[in-house]
Structure formats: C-alpha cells, structure tokens
C-alpha cells in the first residue's frame, strides 16, 4: 500500500515540478521580450516608428497648424515692431537701422517657421544618436541557460510535496502579475512615442512665438520639452541596463523561490523607474 502512495506522491511531484519549470521559463521569456522591446522602441526615430502615423502628423502640422502659426507670427512681429518704435522715445528717435533689424528678424522667424518640422526632427535625431551610441554598452541579458534550468529542476525534485505545491501557486500568481507588469511597460514606452507625435503636431505654434522677448518663453519651454522627451529614451535605456544587470544575478542563482520573487521585484522596480523617467528628464531640462 505504501508503494502506491509513494508512486502517487512522486507523480504529483513530477507534475508540480513540470508546472513550476514551465511557469518559470515562461516568466523569464516574458521579461526578455519586454526588455528587448524597450531597447528597440527607444532606439527608433519618430519617422521610423510608424510611417503612417508620422505622415499623418506631418500633414496635420503643415496644413492645419502652420497657417495658424503664420497668423500668430504676424501678430508677434507687429507687436515687436511697435515695441521697437516705442522704446526709442515714442518715435522721437527713429533710426532706419531699426527697420532693417526688424526685417531681418522677420525673415529669420519665417525661415524657422517654414522649417519647423526639420528642426524638430533634428532634435530627435540628436537624441537618437546618443541613445544608439549608448545601446552598445548594454551587454547583459536575462536568458536562462539550459544548465541553470537543469540545476533548478534538480533542486525542485529534492523538495517535498507541500513546498512544491506552495511554490507552484506562487509561480502561477506571479506569472499573472508579470503579464500585468508587461502591459505597464508597453504603456510607458508606447506612451512616450505618442507624446513625441503630439508635441510634433503642434510645433509651429510655439515656434511662432520665439522672436519676441515676452512671448518667447513659450517657444523656449517647447524646445526644452522636445529635448526632455527625446533624452527620456536615454534614461529608459539606462533603466533597462541596470535592470539587465540586476536580473542576471537572480537568473543564474540556484534558489528557485528567490529567482521568482527577485524577478517580479526587479520588474516592479523597473516599472517604477520607467514612470519616473519622464518627470526626471523634464526637471533636468527645466521644462514645465
């Protein structure tokens, strides 16, 4: 009778070990996929990320927003001329060079406005160049080698039925948690790119305010926002690099319980730091 019970226990232990190994293997596979997507997404320019969306945003900017920006620029330059005249003792000391200065400023402002999209893309090209140069530094991965999986299976097979069942429940629940965390990572990374497109679509309006001292703060803050969201990708890449180093230490650890909880803990930490990259980048560049 005892050998029947022992056989049933061994059969249940085999099922639980297979289930735990399947959950653990899939758990790290999801982590690898998410980390790989982050590194790929932040290293992509707005034009390459989605050609259809990029074309639509450019058409909206040039056909709907640019005419409004032209009207705003007209008012700004008219106000600038009035200010220049008033500053010279209420028209009592008017020099012809003032008008040449105003014409030159207007010419430069019009040139900037007509090349708004190229200037915006140049900002992101600079940030993407920095990101791509930094991407080669990340050499660590989170892949589990067959030797590590074999050692984990050996440890699991030596455990009793009760701890195995508890570990299987933990691995199952944590796998569901990791799916939710992967969704959060997706939202953060894709949300950044959507924010880039939204900033790009309205670019002509803040560009039109740059020539005047009183309204120029709007354009200056817009420039800071462009650099902030561009270099946010570098901060995201740094977070992924730190995460890859941390996760590698638990991926090669022989303790299955620690590997599971360590993985979910570091992934929660990654999500938290990814959320902070946006505000950190804006504080660094002084935009609000």
Predicted regions and their residues:
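Gly/Ser-rich, low-complexity
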Residues: 1-72, 88-97, 107-177, 216-221, ...
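Hydrophobic alpha-helical transmembrane segments
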Residues: 67-79, 196
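Membrane-embedded alpha-helices of multi-pass transport/permease systems
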Residues: 75, 120-123, 127, 184-187, ...
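Hydrophobic transmembrane alpha-helices of secondary-active transporters
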Residues: 78-85, 203-213
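Membrane-water interface regions at transmembrane-helix termini and the short interhelical loops
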Residues: 81-94, 182-186, 214-215
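Elongated alpha-helical scaffolds
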Residues: 102-105
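Alpha-helical transmembrane segments of helical membrane proteins, especially in multi-pass transport
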Residues: 174, 178-210, 224-246
């Amino acid at each position: 009778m005892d050998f029947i019970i022992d056989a049933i226990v061994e059969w249940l232990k085999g099922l639980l070990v297979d289930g735990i190994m399947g959950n653990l293997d899939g758990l790290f596979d999801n982590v690898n996929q998410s980390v790989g997507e982050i590194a790929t997404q932040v290293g992509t320019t707005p034009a390459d990320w989605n050609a259809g969306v990029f074309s639509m945003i450019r058409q909206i900017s040039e056909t709907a927003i640019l005419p409004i920006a032209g009207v705003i620029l007209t008012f700004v330059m008219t106000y600038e001329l009035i200010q220049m005249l008033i500053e010279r003792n209420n028209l009592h000391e008017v020099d012809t060079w003032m008008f040449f200065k105003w014409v030159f400023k207007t010419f430069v402002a019009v040139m900037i406005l007509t090349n708004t999209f190229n200037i915006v893309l140049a900002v992101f090209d600079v940030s993407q160049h920095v990101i791509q140069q930094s991407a080669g530094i990340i050499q660590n991965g989170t892949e589990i080698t067959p030797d590590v999986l074999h050692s984990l299976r050996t440890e699991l097979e030596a455990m009793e039925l009760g701890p195995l069942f508890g570990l299987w429940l933990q691995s199952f629940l944590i796998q569901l948690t990791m799916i939710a965390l992967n969704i959060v990572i997706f939202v953060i990374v894709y949300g950044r790119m959507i924010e880039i497109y939204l900033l790009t679509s309205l670019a002509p309006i803040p560009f039109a305010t740059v020539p005047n001292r009183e309204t120029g703060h709007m354009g200056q803050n817009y420039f800071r926002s462009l650099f902030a969201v561009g270099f946010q990708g570098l901060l995201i890449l740094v977070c992924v690099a730190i995460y890859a180093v941390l996760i590698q230490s638990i991926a090669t650890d022989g303790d299955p319980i620690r590997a599971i909880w360590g993985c979910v803990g570091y992934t929660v930490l990654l999500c938290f730091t990814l959320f902070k990259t946006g505000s950190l980048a804006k504080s660094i560049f002084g935009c609000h």
